[in-house]
């Protein structure tokens, strides 16, 4: 929180720290939320968090409207960080993902070892859970491939759906826009029609997600990882 930052940095006042953290948030390096998953934020105050780079800051930096085009090396860094740190470790990840990265699971059963595509009706569970806090942004992986001149040429478009506090964060930092439940379902249906694979985030336990991706093999870093390292 700003109060905690001020305690550790007494040379700066709260207004300065708030402005500085907002700027860093807009860059995508840090994220903010109002959650109480750790039990330390019962009043749901705004808190900032330094994400892991992949999945995390890298994707957010890519969906920044101007930053990644202005600094194309961020696309190179994203691509390499979605590969190099994973070699030698990813091969040991069991089917189901073990709570790492992205995964495709049936929401109703939430069996970690399960590995199959998510039917569109299962995704409606998450959209109903977070209704009123749903957003959409361009696909970070497709944008990365476009900047790098690689991939299958899939149009980056608005394919990445954010939910909960992450959707609010994206709206407040100009990384995305709010959409309704019905609009989200339309995006998912279009993805189904194109043969894309639905993936949900898999790093916060079975009761929370922050995003739904509509992925294609020729552009998605997560699907590439599963193929290169044989981790379904």
Each predicted region: which residue ranges?
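Long, Pro/Ser/Thr-rich low-complexity/intrinsically disordered regulatory tracts in eukaryotic proteins
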Residues: 72-179, 201-204
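Compact structured core domains
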Residues: 174-203, 214-216
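A short, conserved structural fragment
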Residues: 25-39
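Short, amphipathic alpha-helical interaction segments positioned at domain boundaries
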Residues: 38-86
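Short acidic, hydrophobic short linear motifs in intrinsically disordered regions
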Residues: 1-9
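Local cysteine-cluster metal-coordination motifs and their immediate loop/turn environment
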Residues: 137-145, 209-223
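Ferredoxin-like iron-sulfur electron-transfer modules
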Residues: 48, 201-207, 227-232
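Short amphipathic alpha-helical interaction segments
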Residues: 10-26
């Amino acid at each position: 929180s700003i109060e905690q930052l001020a305690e550790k940095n007494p040379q700066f006042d709260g207004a300065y720290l708030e402005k500085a953290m907002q700027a860093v948030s807009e860059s995508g390096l840090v994220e903010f939320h109002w959650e109480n998953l750790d039990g330390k934020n019962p009043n749901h105050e705004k808190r900032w968090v330094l994400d892991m780079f992949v999945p995390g800051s890298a994707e957010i930096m890519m969906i920044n409207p101007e930053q990644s085009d202005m600094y194309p090396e961020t696309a190179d860094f994203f691509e390499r960080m979605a590969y190099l740190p994973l070699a030698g470790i990813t091969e040991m990840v069991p089917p189901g993902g073990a709570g790492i990265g992205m995964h495709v699971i049936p929401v109703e059963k939430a069996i970690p070892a399960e590995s199959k595509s998510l039917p569109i009706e299962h995704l409606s569970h998450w959209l109903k859970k977070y209704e009123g806090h749903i957003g959409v942004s361009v696909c970070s992986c497709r944008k990365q491939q476009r900047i790098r001149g690689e991939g299958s040429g899939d149009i980056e478009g608005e394919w990445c759906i954010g939910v909960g506090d992450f959707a609010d964060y994206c709206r407040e930092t100009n990384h995305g826009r709010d959409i309704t439940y019905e609009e989200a379902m339309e995006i998912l249906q279009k993805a189904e029609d194109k043969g894309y694979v639905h993936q949900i985030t898999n790093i916060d336990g079975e009761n929370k997600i922050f995003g739904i991706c509509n992925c294609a093999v020729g552009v998605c870093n997560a699907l590439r990882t599963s193929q290169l390292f044989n981790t379904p």
